[in-house]
């Protein structure tokens, strides 16, 4: 809950106007600047997520979700060694680019619905579009990794990044450990950001927001149990 600085009344976490005295408690936000918001996620994530939730227009949430889906698709391909079944690199990359956006939108939608349902059980009401936006922007580290690290992985390993004969770690162990390590750090930071975002959105404790973030990670991790070949 948020306390009104004028009359002291308790209001919802992200309320702009006090329900008691009708005074403004915080400035309205119309739109989001992508690069300013991305930087804010690293510099001041809690304040940035509040700004995202308060924004009237949730800019870039759909493109970010689609890019997240593409990154997940390529991670699934790598985990399943799909290069064995599809030896053409261009075909494999095209498949990820085509299917990834649908996967990303589905994942973010389901996680937002899960967050809304679970928080309702905790007597915390959040809007679906706010949960969707927070989760989409929490994926920024993964999206950055997709844009910067994934092309390097393809440049170094080619189709063998998705193969096991030989596995990429055998071809260039140092490059593999560094690049995949950066991917892992990006994924972990996105999980942390999702917890910070939910805390900013619903006023959760660190323990509850951490548990919720781990449930998001577990949900996405469950995708890796699906056999792709």
Regions found by a protein language model. Name each.
Residues 15, 19-34, 92-116:
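Alpha-helical transmembrane segments and their immediate interhelical/interface regions
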Residues 57, 85, 89-101, 105, ...:
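Hydrophobic, aromatic-rich alpha-helical transmembrane segments
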Residues 41-42, 59, 98, 137, ...:
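Hydrophobic alpha-helical transmembrane segments of integral membrane proteins
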């Amino acid at each position: 809950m948020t306390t009104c600085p004028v009359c002291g009344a308790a209001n919802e976490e992200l309320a702009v106007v006090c329900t008691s005295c009708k005074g403004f408690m915080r400035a309205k936000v119309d739109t989001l600047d992508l690069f300013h918001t991305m930087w804010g996620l690293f510099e001041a994530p809690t304040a940035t997520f509040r700004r995202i939730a308060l924004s009237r227009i949730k800019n870039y949430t759909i493109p970010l979700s689609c890019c997240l889906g593409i990154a997940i698709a390529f991670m699934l391909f790598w985990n399943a060694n799909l290069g064995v079944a599809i030896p053409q690199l261009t075909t494999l990359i095209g498949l990820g680019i085509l299917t990834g956006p649908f996967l990303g939108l589905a994942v973010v939608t389901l996680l937002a619905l899960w967050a809304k349902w679970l928080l309702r059980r905790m007597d915390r009401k959040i809007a679906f579009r706010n949960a969707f936006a927070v989760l989409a922007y929490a994926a920024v580290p993964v999206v950055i990794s997709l844009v910067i690290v994934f092309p390097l992985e393809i440049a170094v390993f080619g189709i063998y990044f998705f193969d096991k004969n030989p596995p990429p770690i055998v071809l260039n162990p140092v490059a593999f450990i560094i690049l995949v390590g950066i991917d892992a750090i990006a994924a972990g930071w996105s999980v942390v950001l999702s917890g910070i975002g939910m805390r900013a959105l619903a006023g959760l404790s660190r323990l509850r927001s951490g548990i919720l973030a781990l449930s998001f990670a577990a949900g996405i991790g469950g995708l890796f149990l699906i056999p792709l070949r």
